[in-house]
């Protein structure tokens, strides 16, 4: 699975453990092999929202089910990468209002390792592949640091 270039959307594709994990999480959902011929950039295409696309979106809007699914996969990938790096399973829980605001938490043992308030979820996306990778890696690194600071709670 190589990351391919998709210059029209998202700029140059970057090599990232987070993007590789996100692709793996999404491909795991494909039980019938419909996405086997798609490149990784095609799989992740909907995570890219250009500045022009974001400007055309309404200020207030309801998120559609596909967008909520993508957001869930984003946080699932974070949880799995945290588990790979620490050995502690990190599961997500989210509460989302139909108008696009809510909260997501990742919990390892008895420890909250990620806590993020969400708003304007209908605009969820990243301008470039690099920003998508950076956002995921930043949350993973923060969660790993929290687990390393409180290992007893994370392993409880």
Curated annotation (Swiss-Prot):
Keywords per UniProt: Nitrogen fixation
InterPro entries linked to this entry: NifX-assoc_nitrogen_fix
GO biological process: nitrogen fixation
Pfam families (alphabetical): DUF269 (PF03270)
The organism's place on the tree of life at top rank: Bacteria
Record-annotated membrane-spanning stretches: none
Family: Belongs to the UPF0460 family.
NCBIfam families in the cross-refs: NifX-associated nitrogen fixation protein
Protein name, entry field: UPF0460 protein in nifX 3'region
Organism: Rhodobacter capsulatus
């Amino acid at each position: 699975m190589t990351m391919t270039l998709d210059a029209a959307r998202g700029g140059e594709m970057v090599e990232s453990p987070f993007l590789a994990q996100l692709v793996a999480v999404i491909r795991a959902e494909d039980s019938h092999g419909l996405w086997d011929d798609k490149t990784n950039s095609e799989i992740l295409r909907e995570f890219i929202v250009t500045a022009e696309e974001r400007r055309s979106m309404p200020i207030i809007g309801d998120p559609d089910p596909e967008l909520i699914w993508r957001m869930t996969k984003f946080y699932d990938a974070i949880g799995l990468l945290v588990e790979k790096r620490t050995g502690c399973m990190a599961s997500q829980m989210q509460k989302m209002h139909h108008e696009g605001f809510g909260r997501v938490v990742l919990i390892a043992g008895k420890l909250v390792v990620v806590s993020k308030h969400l708003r304007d979820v209908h605009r969820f996306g990243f301008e470039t592949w690099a920003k998508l990778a950076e956002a995921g890696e930043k949350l993973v690194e923060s969660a790993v640091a929290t687990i390393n600071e409180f290992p007893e709670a994370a392993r409880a």
